[in-house]
Amino acid sequence: MRTKEQAEELGIPLTTLDEYSVLDVAIDGADEVDPDLNLVKGGGGALLREKMVEVCAKKFIVIVDETKLCDGLGPGFPVPVEITPFCHMHTLRLIGGLPSLAGCTPKLRMGSSSSNQPDGDEIAVTDNGNYIVDLEFTEPIKDVPKAASELKNTVGVVDHGLFIGMSTAVIIAGSDGVYVKK
């Protein structure tokens, strides 16, 4: 929403995915990138909208600095999950019981949906009117595709911040310069 407001203030024309459902390219950042170019995204709370844009793109290019690279997704950045407000505590318990997420601690995000840090006493609400659960891991997720599938098939889960096999290329800024992984 902030980007939309800034674009309007600057007179930049906007359109919608309903009008143009195929994009040549989408460019975005990521919270974590594993060696297979799987991603954790949505730390800012817009994971569903981000995923909807990326699936409409013929190419999805990710730009990160080298601190976002990891050996396995999970322990470096909480995995956000967007859930419905209705029966949200039940959904939280279901997520906590998923076999592929053993060892994770699901926590309802409090405060601003755009911060993965508690910055208020109210439950964080997304632009879609849903809640965010942050999954905190001490070990990397062992089977990322299975975790993504189990989350997606959990009643009450709208979507998750695991972006599996979606990136075409990752542009990485590091201490030795910029390089691309495909």
Predicted feature residues:
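Conserved phosphate- and dinucleotide-binding cores of soluble alpha/beta proteins
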Residues: R2-K182
